[in-house]
Amino acid sequence: MIEKAGSKVEKRSSKGGATVLIVGAGPAGLVLGNLLLAAGVDCLIVERSSRAHVERRARAGFLAAETVRVLVGNGLGAGLLARGRTHGTCVFRTERGEFALRYGSLGRGEAHTVYPQQDLVSDLVAEFLRRGGDLRFGTPVSEVGGLDGERPWLMAHGPQGPYRLTGRYVAGCDGRQGTCRRQIPAGEVRAHRRRHGVSWLALLVGTPPALPAVTYAVHERGFAGHMARTPSVTRYYLQCEPGTDPGSWSETAVWDELDLRMRAERFGPLRRGPVLERAVVDLESDVLDPMQYGRLFLAGDAAGLISPSAAKGANLAVMAAQTLARAFTTAVHEGDEEALARYSATCLPRIWRAQEFSHWMIGLLHAPHGDDEESRFLRALRDSRLENLRTSTVQQHSFADNYAGL
């Protein structure tokens, strides 16, 4: 027995395995690993990418208040408390003008903390290693087996070649395209999928935020968005045609289109600067039900994908990791697997609430461009939703609860 993070943890061989095998070092896997170590549950994490890649991978940075409470309450929030910024206002721009919703003062009175996901991941990696955790970067997993038995295993491929890891449970936190969800036999889970028919050109630019709040611009040429990331980096989105080559947009074209859709001539100029990263994001959603099969439990994007329209993905990952950590801890220390059996039933209502609001946001921000009767009808519906959000305090309180909550 050795001491780790104030708890006694059984230590297994360096390659043989652990009680909980975690695949993937994103927010779900890292929060899960840290919580298990703190609870005295032996675990290890394998991650296909390098540490450098994981720690610089830019992702959404809006953390809900409940997520912050989980991180801070478990000793994982020092970085976000020191460097995160409270954000409680969002702005909508339309042809009728601009209106701000101070959602941090509406509903439950909760705001977001802006803290880039790559910074959070770096914090979680450092804390996991500080607690003595076993984290193996550059180690893809090609197969997971034994899931319907007592000793599940996975085949890992490290720098010295392939080897098998065995454990009592496997946590699949390796994303939608990861190995774990592909190992579930056909017919054992039901996938609910929706392709929203909307694509965004996602841009990370090397300029300070031009606006004090998240700003959603609805324009006849398509949606545009402004989201702060750090004091020197800003995220922008431009709605584009599905299948667009991100490289086909020159920097001049990007900024000209942002100026047009954000109505810079009317509301003030944007801060132009270099485009550091660009990618086309197709807005899609899927949910697996159940989120488990045998000894395999999925969390984060491995269990379901949510569109970025409402910034819920990382928050759902953290909440699922907390639920799973509690269930593993009870199973290991008390021999009671009831919470594990209920894992999907516990998580799915929260996930579907987030999916519903994300779907509503997509309808709020997008509408067809055509001049046919149906397109005109859908645009009028969208405009009515925006006007209702602008004028109805009941709608504003409901929006705040869903936008900032989980």
Give, region by region, the residue ranges found by the protein language model.
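Conserved FAD-binding catalytic core of PHBH/FMO-like flavoproteins
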Residues: 126, 133, 143, 149-279
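Conserved mid-domain beta->alpha element of the FAD-binding
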Residues: 23-38, 124, 279-360
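C-terminal helical "tail/cap" subdomain of flavin- and related membrane-associated enzymes
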Residues: 3-14, 311, 326-406
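Active-site-adjacent segment of FAD-dependent monooxygenases/related oxidoreductases
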Residues: 56-59, 64-131, 355-358
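Extreme N-terminal leader/targeting segments of oxidoreductases
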Residues: 1-20, 35-39
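Generic enzyme active-site microenvironment
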Residues: 45-46, 172, 217, 299
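Glycine-rich FAD pyrophosphate-binding loop
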Residues: 37-59
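Conserved SAM/SAH-binding loop
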Residues: 138-142
